[in-house]
Amino acid sequence: MSHLILNPGTLTLSQIREISRGKVSLELADSAINDINTSAGLVQQVLDEGRTVYGINTGFGLLANTKIAADDLQLLQRSIVLSHAAGTGQYMQDATVRLMMVLKINSLSRGFSGIRLEVINFLIALVNAEVYPCVPEKGSVGASGDLAPLAHMCLPLLGEGEMSYKGQILSAKEGLEIAGLKPIELAAKEGLALLNGTQASTALALEGLFNAEDLFAASSVIGAMSVEAAMGSRSPFDSRIHAARGQKGQIDSAALFRLLLGDESEISLSHVDCERVQDPYSLRCQPQVLGACLTQIRHAAEVLGTEANGVTDNPLVFQDTGDIISGGNFHAEPVAMAADNLAIALAELGSIAERRIALLIDPNLSMLPPFLVENGGVNSGFMIAQVTAAALASENKTYAHPASVDSLPTSANQEDHVSMATFAARRLRDMTENTRGVLAIELLASAQGLDFRAPLQPSVVVAKAKAEIRELVTYYDKDRFFGPDIEAATDLLITASFNAYLPDGILPSL
């Protein structure tokens, strides 16, 4: 478990990756406490002066013009949490909820939200106790923030809802006892500050970002394996070609392939004078395709890194003037578009990988045995594995349709344009699984192709990558139950071990 002293608004992508992948012990920096207390004091000042301010002593949404009596303000906070906890579907994974909570703590602690330190410390205590609220994954349209998911996240503060602890689903009462906590009463504005924000969609999108980074690394390494297995040329990776175009992602991708393939190998030297003039695009244009994906990954990382440190509830409290201003930072359009870009990148990583599998099993293109198996006819080899890859790649094409272009008005047309960011981000998990499956099959196919090239050896790095999969899956000498092989290759990709083949600075969070 890592220990993080949180200076609000300064989370790095590498820190966020660590939080999303493992448990964290969280401590709020002392320097944040004054801003939190000052902000909460300004909310209390509004009440003391009898002023009417949206979100403090009014209704919400279409009911914003309804003033709430002072005696009903605590009931209002409880009511908004209970009424907005209307999500459906399976519960999010604990890791997602943990990241969502840390992002919410990070935002609230910047001192723009008018929330008391007691409430923030309650959330920190839950994170540190590893007792997480149960949050259904469906029910948010990404404006006015992720209302339903965040309401479910906040139910335990009131002693309501369910919680997850070490794989067990508990009542809020049981979960709070484990954490050594008791329910609290929310003060004016606190319910809205907790529920308003983009932390659910941002957490899901960040998970998608980190998975996309891992799969970019895997796609590069496995793509290099396929170049060697198919006796592809190194010429398309020449730095002069990519410098002439000037696309940064492409230039970096080509440099990575040169690193993975080296200047030459026994395999490459064996076909220097072959009659094939050009390779198919799935080999030759990898820097162009993967480089474009890398550009999208980097752009999404910039957007999501900013959002993770932003303040996205409403209204906001400005300490320098005492102003409390209503705006629209809860609208998750930046998150939705970033997630859409990641979806396109994931789809393309899988799409070009499937084409390389098809190339390897086709003897006319790869000059390898049909379907990568001896005694073809009796053995079908990789025939249906390629069909599986095609099915996964095709499914991703549907998933990649932009979610951010859709909008349905809500709250009696008060909230008349929404982002659909939560679905945009949530579908990235399914797309990750599909792309990972395609790459797992290509990993098996390229290793099989390299075995057929023996005794000729590939580049040092490619040989090392091949050895990783051969520790788990043996040479395919005849037909056998294929499912476990794909599962083993998939499990290897889940470990993200291929990230180690990339130099520093290629991927934003590594």
From Swiss-Prot:
Gene Ontology cellular component list: cytoplasm
Superkingdom of origin organism: Bacteria
Record keywords: Cytoplasm, Histidine metabolism, Lyase
EC number assigned by the record: 4.3.1.3
PTM annotation, UniProt: Contains an active site 4-methylidene-imidazol-5-one (MIO), which is formed autocatalytically by cyclization and dehydration of residues Ala-Ser-Gly.
GO molecular function terms attached to this record: histidine ammonia-lyase activity
Keyword Cytoplasm among record annotations: yes
Single Gene Ontology BP annotation: L-histidine catabolic process to glutamate and formate
Cross-link position per record: 5-imidazolinone (Ala-Gly): 143-145
Pfam family, one: Lyase_aromatic
SUPFAM superfamilies associated with the record: L-aspartase-like
This protein's pathway: Amino-acid degradation; L-histidine degradation into L-glutamate; N-formimidoyl-L-glutamate from L-histidine: step 1/3
Catalytic activity field: L-histidine = trans-urocanate + NH4(+)
Subcellular locations according to the entry: Cytoplasm
Residues modified as 2,3-didehydroalanine (Ser): 144
First and last residue of the signal peptide: none
Family, per entry: Belongs to the PAL/histidase family.
PANTHER family to which the protein is assigned, alphabetical: HISTIDINE AMMONIA-LYASE
UniProt name for this protein: Histidine ammonia-lyase
Organism phylogeny: Bacteria, Pseudomonadati, Pseudomonadota, Gammaproteobacteria, Alteromonadales
